[in-house]
Amino acid sequence: MGNQKLKWTAEEEEALLAGVRKHGPGKWKNILRDPELAEQLSSRSNIDLKDKWRNLSVAPGIQGSKDKIRTPKIKAAAFHLAAAAAAAIVTPTHSGHSSPVATLPRSGSSDLSIDDSFNIVADPKNAPRYDGMIFEALSNLTDANGSDVSAIFNFIEQRQEVPPNFRRMLSSRLRRLAAQGKLEKVSHLKSTQNFYKMNDNSLVQRTPHVARPKESNTKSRQQTNSQGPSISQQIVEASITAAYKLVEVENKLDVSKGAAEEIERLMKLAEEADEMLVIAREMHEECSQGKIMYLN
């Protein structure tokens, strides 16, 4: 038997890879019996080869289902960014040409290496307002079977001013509210979409929101301050962009976790198939020699 505590050497790994290329994965006994590889793998067993091949086969960026996939420390960074944005709106700086976005604090965990195309995240500052929009839409869309994301989005878009990527953010907010028990998620056997409707907790948790009408030609009272609107707009855009990225990262982590579980399931099935094949071959060899085998 092999010694699993003995660290694998480069020669042993090369011999294992050469054996898999020659005999195929799962043919551990054949690899150990190969005259060209027997010397390098003399201290290893078929179980050692199987475990080592599994470690080499799993992609380095994917963890098994038993390992918890830890969310990157970016949620706190997004919240700090939104908090700084709110503070800057309340007490704007009066420096001549400095941009308020440049004054936002940066930490080591806030430097996100994320593709620029992933620009959706929930804005924690506007989350209560978005929840109010959702509750208002479901209150008016009185469907006993629930309403899907498209119906809720169309209702809100016709009555409120929303960001360009509000549809994706709406889907995330609906899942969160359903997980918190504030909405009821309805499942349909023949549908791949999710449907939502109000429940008893929705009436308790519902918070009124101030409706934001679509743009009109009315003048704002804050036009007396020439720099105020532009500063607030830049800060809000920065906080929304940071929040959008958080939701996209969470979605990608869910996909990664599902892929890891599927890979582990397929590998387990392959191992079981290899073991059954080895047993069948041994039985065939015994029977071909005229021996009688008894099956319990």
From Swiss-Prot:
Cellular localisation: Nucleus; Chromosome
Highest taxon above the source species: Eukaryota
InterPro entries tied to this protein: Histone_H1/H5_H15, Homeodomain-like_sf, Myb_dom, SANT/Myb, SMH1-6, WH-like_DNA-bd_sf
DNA-binding region: 28-58
SUPFAM superfamilies xref list: Homeodomain-like
GO biological process: nucleosome assembly
Any Pfam family: Myb_DNA-binding
Residues of the HTH myb-type domain: 1-62
Region of interest (Disordered), residue spans: 197-232
Biased composition, class Polar residues, residue ranges: 219-232
Keywords, ordered alphabetically: Chromosome, Coiled coil, DNA-binding, Nucleus, Transcription, Transcription regulation
Annotated ranges, domain H15: 126-200
GO terms of molecular function: DNA-binding transcription factor activity; double-stranded telomeric DNA binding; transcription cis-regulatory region binding
Alphabetized PROSITE patterns for the sequence: H15 (PS51504), HTH_MYB (PS51294)
GO cellular component, one term: nucleus
Coiled coil: 245-282
Family stated for the protein in its record: Belongs to the histone H1/H5 family. SMH subfamily.
Functional summary from the UniProt entry: Binds preferentially double-stranded telomeric repeats.
Free-text comment about domains: HTH myb-type domain confers double-stranded telomeric DNA-binding while the H15 domain is involved in non-specific DNA-protein interaction and multimerization.
PANTHER family: SINGLE MYB HISTONE 4 (PTHR46267), TELOMERE REPEAT-BINDING FACTOR 4-RELATED (PTHR46267:SF3)
Name of the protein described by the UniProt record: Telomere repeat-binding factor 4
Organism name: Arabidopsis thaliana
